[in-house]
Amino acid sequence: MSLLLRDFERADALDAALSERLIDGLVAAIDARGEAILAVSGGRTPAGLFKCLSEAPLDFSKVMITLTDERCVPLDHPDSNAQMVERLLLQRNAKQSRFIPLYDSAMDRAAQCQSLNLQFNRLPIFDAVVLGMGLDGHTASLFPGATGLPAAMDLSSDTAVTLIQPLTAPHARMTLTAARLLKTRALILHVTGDEKLSLLNEVRAGAGAMQYPVGLFLAQNAPATEVFWAP
């Protein structure tokens, strides 16, 4: 297990450092290939990060942004990750970026999943993926015990996006699979709080990936997971 841990005294210091880390990678991608692609998570944790990113001096017209996962709810629902991204990240300088949402409430879910797979399998590998983590060890929408979890965690799978039903959280989800999330140049885990740090240490000690799906990502060496943590 190759894991790089960066810890900060305050969440705002973490947000600034992680934003700088991501911008450096996106700039390098644009310089090398003319475009960059970033996958971000929703939830409460990345709110400050999104604000930092939105203000960064970057040519966002050359950046694609997508989500690691999405709840199957309308865009105006308070649990919508896309709504959060549009409200906090796709502002100021980042307004120019191209956003790829994972859910449209007007479409049939199965048809939408098929369409997303075609789209994501045509996209290049990510330049950075920013994951979060729940206290149950889930990341993206890879929840312990969820219907569809083994297939979504299969690293040999060609499936990029799958529909998953958590047993312990509301709403069906569209999630990028583990195999697609790991097609990235940089893999970052963004976590806050002492409880989550304790869980990380437990997972690093050898808890199984089906018990704590985040463990699958922490176990990767290429790319190694970069953990950004603050209390």
Task: Label each region the model flagged.
Residues A13, P74-P231:
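Conserved phosphate- and dinucleotide-binding cores of soluble alpha/beta proteins
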Residues S2-Q112, Q119:
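N-terminal active-site beta-alpha-beta segment that forms phosphate/nucleotide-binding
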Residues M1-S2, P231:
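Absolute protein N-terminus
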